[in-house]
């Protein structure tokens, strides 16, 4: 039905170029997921439009149908491809993509934000902001229990109240209850944001933090974008690739052996790394400023490819 609505609408017909971008969407974690996204590219070509996969994160592709959809649509209907990491390029190649694939960077790090006054302005303690989500809750319950229990134990280590703890759900509908449960079971005093925030407000909150601890990729990228030292909990190659390309020296590994290595989350390791970043906050912020400026240059590749397509 949605596809028919799109055909009847003028969105594609009135456009000159159709860009499909974002991270994690082009993967067959759901059987029909590649088809559900790429069908719009086919539709765009039927209307004679130029098409581009813009700074995407791709893979994994584990089903024959998923690989077929990617191979068929990209080889026949895509004009330009930029990907944000080597791993994404490799997944496309393994699926049989023959088109040129250009490695660039994640455009989120180029986000600018206007400084705004928030209720969080006046702080007397160092602020640690957590961006957490219930990863693997449905797909791997035992690994999810490790994640939940490890995070509860980790948060309990801040019971001395020396730090201000702030929990920032990125997808409120999915993440809020998980964050609330972590706070309630750990018994600590913490603030929990309970509204969907726009990117500008989110970046202001991250900028006013002393360290960001994030499970979500874009929690890490947005922290880097506003110059706040961060501790990524890496559960997917997309986050690992970003950290590697940025040149950041901190990460905590956690995974089930599919999208990332098979490793339980260690609360003591998480706490020790958080404390180290806080102790080195000023030096790390200066280093991060240099690293993010270099990484931002990768976004120029995306724009250069787009300009070439526009010609």
Region roles according to the model:
Residues 1-311:
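Active-site anion-handling motifs in enzyme catalytic cores
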């Amino acid at each position: 039905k949605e596809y028919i609505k799109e055909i009847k609408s003028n969105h594609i017909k009135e456009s000159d170029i159709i860009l499909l971008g974002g991270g994690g969407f082009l993967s067959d974690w759901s059987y029909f997921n590649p088809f559900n996204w790429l069908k719009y590219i086919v539709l765009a070509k039927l209307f004679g439009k130029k098409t581009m996969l813009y700074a995407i994160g791709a893979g994994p592709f584990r089903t024959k149908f998923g690989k077929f959809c990617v191979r068929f649509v990209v080889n026949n209907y895509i004009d330009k491809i930029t990907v944000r990491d080597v791993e994404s390029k490799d997944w496309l190649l393994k699926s049989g993509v023959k088109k040129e694939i250009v490695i660039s960077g994640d455009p989120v790090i180029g986000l600018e934000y206007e400084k705004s006054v928030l209720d969080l302005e006046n702080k007397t303690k160092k602020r640690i902001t957590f961006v957490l989500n219930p990863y693997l809750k449905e797909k791997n319950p035992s690994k999810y229990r490790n994640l939940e229990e490890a995070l509860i134990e980790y948060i309990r280590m801040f019971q001395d109240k020396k730090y201000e703890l702030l929990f920032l759900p990125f997808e409120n509908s999915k993440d809020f209850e998980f964050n609330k449960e972590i706070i309630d079971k750990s018994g600590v005093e913490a603030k929990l944001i309970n509204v969907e925030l726009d990117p500008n407000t989110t970046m202001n909150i991250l900028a006013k933090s002393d360290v960001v601890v994030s499970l979500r990729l874009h929690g890490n990228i947005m922290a880097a974008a506003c110059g706040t030292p961060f501790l990524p909990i890496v559960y997917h190659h997309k986050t690992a690739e970003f950290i590697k390309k940025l040149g950041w020296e901190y990460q905590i590994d956690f995974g089930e052996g599919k999208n990332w290595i098979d490793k339980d989350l260690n609360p003591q390791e998480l706490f020790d790394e958080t404390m180290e970043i806080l102790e080195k906050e000023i030096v790390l912020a200066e280093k991060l400023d240099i690293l993010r400026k270099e990484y931002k240059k990768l976004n120029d590749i995306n724009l250069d490819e787009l300009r070439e397509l526009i010609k």
